[in-house]
A protein has these predicted regions:
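Single, function-defining residue in the core of a domain
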Residues: 3, 7, 11-178
Length: 178
């Protein structure tokens, strides 16, 4: 966007950038919280604005990974599901049995090894490796939920794509370049 339009969101010398962060309620299929920010601030700062609900699931992409914020979600009695970054170092504590015909390749209890992740989130986490049988895409999930099945966690993450479709719709109708 040009600076004449979004002067409040500078990004480069002659260009502005706006980030739209949303919280999407899966049950009602309504965006329950929307936050605009300039393009200079990191995406994870959005999590500080969210009022957390007990037993709610917060499903997010890798840009929102912050173990300090995950701890806040966990302490609120809520759950998160995200994709595991490839550079994350963890230690496997236990492997749950899986049926690989469902697409679940592994379901593990892990603990983070790196200093800051283990400092901010010392509790156990769950790592789920999933292969989408339709698209052959391989995904690794990280969650603090140990109650749902691994397949249910993978299905929850698929709901995140509804937000991506919303952003695609906005870009098409407002003629915004990314």
């Amino acid at each position: 966007l040009g600076l004449r339009i979004d002067w409040w969101a500078p990004f480069r010398k002659n260009k502005g950038a706006v980030k739209l962060h949303t919280q999407f309620d899966i049950k009602t299929e309504i965006h329950s919280f929307v936050h605009l920010s300039d393009g200079l601030h990191h995406d994870i700062n959005f999590l500080d604005q969210v009022s957390l609900e007990k037993k709610a699931f917060y499903i997010m992409d890798k840009a929102y990974i912050s173990f300090k914020r995950f701890s806040r979600i966990h302490d609120a009695g809520a759950f998160f599901v995200t994709r595991l970054q490839t550079n994350q170092d963890y230690r496997r504590i236990y492997s749950n049995p899986v049926d690989k015909t469902t697409g679940i390749m592994c379901d593990q209890v892990i603990r983070m090894n790196n200093f800051y992740p283990s400092k901010f989130y010392p509790d156990y986490l769950r790592r789920i490796k999933y292969r989408d049988v339709v698209g052959e895409k391989r995904l690794e999930f990280l969650t603090n939920n140990f109650e749902l099945s691994a397949l249910e966690i993978a299905a929850l993450y698929k709901y995140r794509w509804r937000i991506e479709l919303f952003f695609k719709w906005i870009k098409q109708h407002l003629k915004i370049k990314s």
